[in-house]
């Protein structure tokens, strides 16, 4: 259910701004998006798993806050990221 370390490392490499970057807003948002996508598939199969639903809502809130921060600080990076992740259709 959770992201494997290998998958998380792939995401970090794909979205890192420089070598060793694990904490930039882009990386954090990409990792949260992958977690959210996995939880969405889990919730489709287990509709009454309210503990996982609460975790999903917390992750969505964290991603929303990071996206708001990125939009307010650097709109160009924000637009590129949402396009790469397929958010905001």
Swiss-Prot record:
The keyword rRNA-binding applies. The gene is rpsO. It comes from Leuconostoc mesenteroides subsp. mesenteroides (strain ATCC 8293 / DSM 20343 / BCRC 11652 / CCM 1803 / JCM 6124 / NCDO 523 / NBRC 100496 / NCIMB 8023 / NCTC 12954 / NRRL B-1118 / 37Y). Part of the 30S ribosomal subunit. Forms a bridge to the 50S subunit in the 70S ribosome, contacting the 23S rRNA. SUPFAM superfamilies: S15/NS1 RNA-binding domain. GO terms for biological process: translation. InterPro entries: Ribosomal_uS15 (IPR000589), Ribosomal_uS15_bac-type (IPR005290), uS15_NS1_RNA-bd_sf (IPR009068). Keywords: Ribonucleoprotein, Ribosomal protein, RNA-binding, rRNA-binding. One of the primary rRNA binding proteins, it binds directly to 16S rRNA where it helps nucleate assembly of the platform of the 30S subunit by binding and bridging several RNA helices of the 16S rRNA. Forms an intersubunit bridge (bridge B4) with the 23S rRNA of the 50S subunit in the ribosome. The keyword Ribonucleoprotein applies. Belongs to the universal ribosomal protein uS15 family. GO terms for cellular component: cytosolic small ribosomal subunit. This is Small ribosomal subunit protein uS15. SMART domains: Ribosomal_S15. One of its GO terms (molecular function) is structural constituent of ribosome.
